[in-house]
Amino acid sequence: MFSRAFSSGVQPVEIARKLAKEMDAHKTASVSRVYVPNEYTVWLAPDDYARFKDYETSLAQELSAHLLEHARRNEFDLLTRPVVGQDRKSVV
């Protein structure tokens, strides 16, 4: 998900911004609505995942709420509340 290395590790606010950009990039216009994806997967480097592991559920809920608010502000339509998951595969 992140193409550059963060010297101090990725921060949750950076993840939130990137997810919102992904939402914007993958919108689909229908006749009267603009739909956006409702499922998002975050890939983290092992060190970053280790830092967030203890509050992964809370962070996922916060990121979901951020995406929901972003969709509302931009008048996007979602089929369900956004779901944010984390892929536990190593990313280098």
Where is each model-derived feature located?
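Short glycine-/polar-rich loops that comprise or flank the Walker A/P-loop
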Residues: L79-P82
